[in-house]
């Protein structure tokens, strides 16, 4: 086609397009002008309305000055002539706890929850964010972390106030998972210090743990052993909904507010279990009767008002409590939108507190602790054990849930005669997939300290995580979440955070138990604590300048002599050794018991690397017995070792240990026959045999075995228990020595017949080997100590130690483990782990004190002693 023809035909098309384009542009331009004029007119019209018809600074003013065509008085709604901003400026401003652009400089509103008026700072009723919103100050949550060795307190505050803030059911994992949604709490975590978690006491319930936190006492000691309980001496029932909750007869111990008041300080509590009870006849100086209907903001605002009191009236110590995220966790479970919303709610409340403190220039003056009482775990109606599946008829009363107890229905008449043993027997080892273990309360793990109180019923069920135990189907709600479980479960771990001039900054600390908080609070207040179950000084590492410096316990019974005088015994004690046929052979092995001074020093260095245990019991006649492979502290009155200490190095090979030399026992020539056990003692008792505290074959050679095949190494053991004890030493001890590059072992008997967690007086021991005066232990302890830095061995450890202590019940059967038709490797280690303990628990049960010659500050030794190893990994 000719190019000119092509151009000719395209020209009309281009002209039409251009015409349409011009029309479209004109239309758009016109629309733009119209919109601009509309906006201009609208804004122009609005300006006089804002100036003439706005309620700003005129709320509830009946004079109508400066208003045309609308009103801002309280009757305008009924008349229908309110100004356009009346609702936002006048009504909503009385319903919120914050300032905004409408409120800044407002006329004072009498009904307002807080003020944003220009004189609010002077009148001390500002909303907590007044300075940030109305004066442009940087909010606390976004400002940089403060750092100062000295308190930054305003005039009138000679000592930093202490605030204890509890967020019920805030499990430690929440803070790890949702910290980005919690800016205020996360700021505290970043700038202050926090623990990986804080361990709650058992049962992990609200009232027992809150009262433990403020008394430093175990629930068995302070009396609030559960949220629901019966006291046979009072013949009354306690529950959170009953009037008995306010009866001081239930509440023992000295809560921190009373400790402070007794020493001249004032204390205030905006809720805390026990704070609205006349404990010991007294309330805190300022307190509120509990009501869950009071908004969190109101609680915070009131606490801030208490801080504004004149110096002579102002408290030094404050508690505040909020119900979330516990309530949401119960309703929806721990992994739920409801819990996230509740976490944000408590974060906002905490942020309000910190903004209020900053507004008073107290944010770097106050020592504040934020913690929880326990965690939360998921439950389901698919995970419930019903007692009707175990009994044809339920003729007992049961406290249901995650920490069940069983007692008689007929109270008080049958309380003490109820056959608890039969209930435990009928519930033991019934199913292969049974999700609880029944215990008589005295047999519960000693680390729980949950036995010595008449309110703790004698039958107890330890329930698997996320399971419940009920009487029968349909007896209670089972969906959602709950707590109360074994306090070693990770889901029961609680938060602990702290911030203030006394605390270290930007620090993460190892987990600890909440019984230690009371002593910490006393140190912050510079007062002396009442007697409690905590270990004072164990939390010194949280503080920049600790108020209290602990010291080692004083030894109350010195060791006497058990010297070597003759190589042949005065009395054979009915003992014999087939391997030693002549007196010359016996004399030769006995000479090994006569160590030189150099040999004593060598065995002390190897087998007592941290010093011998000190005896804190009074009038405990004992002597030290030295051997090349172990050292013993021999108790003369009980005719057995109180403790034995030895070190097991990491073995060069993993071959099994040789058998113990058979049919070989002899009298220890260093111990008087009247203070020794006879080998014939065990012939009459069909259920008890002799065991060895120090395992003779642990070193692998016969010569050293003879040093242990002596009467001073004998302890009475139930035959079933001995199977477990022997397996531990032959297999597990070697395993731990391999894993830890050697372990120092201290083991011994425990006597706790009154199950109070402390060593018994002689007249409290009630069971003896048949026909003898040899007492039968209630438990045996084993404390394994290694170097935390595993490149070092226990006897050459320059730094921190690691511990693995056990307190295992000494019982005639192993029914706790249901071992029938099971190999020992399937249940023995699990049994030992179930009875893990703290070194401090061992000390209380034995009257011994460990690690006195370890070159480390005593406060650091206390950290070691109060450490509880855990094996739980599932949240």
From Swiss-Prot:
The chain crosses the membrane at residues 12-30. The N-terminal is blocked. Residues 1-11 are cytoplasmic. Zn(2+) 2 binds at residues 326, 330, 483. This is Ectonucleotide pyrophosphatase/phosphodiesterase family member 3. It is an enzyme of class 3 (hydrolase). Binds 2 zinc ions per subunit. Hydrolase that metabolizes extracellular nucleotides, including ATP, GTP, UTP and CTP. Limits mast cells and basophils response during inflammation and during the chronic phases of allergic responses by eliminating extracellular ATP, a signaling molecule activating these cells in an autocrine manner. Metabolizes extracellular ATP in the lumen of the small intestine, and thereby prevents ATP-induced apoptosis of intestinal plasmacytoid dendritic cells. Ca(2+) binds at residues 752, 754, 756, 758, 760. Pfam families: Phosphodiest, Somatomedin_B. Residues 51-94, 95-139 form the SMB domain. Keywords: ATP-binding, Calcium, Cell membrane, Disulfide bond, Glycoprotein, Hydrolase, Membrane, Metal-binding, Nucleotide-binding, Repeat, Secreted, Signal-anchor, Transmembrane, Transmembrane helix, Zinc. It comes from Rattus norvegicus. ATP binds at residues 205, 227, 276, 290.
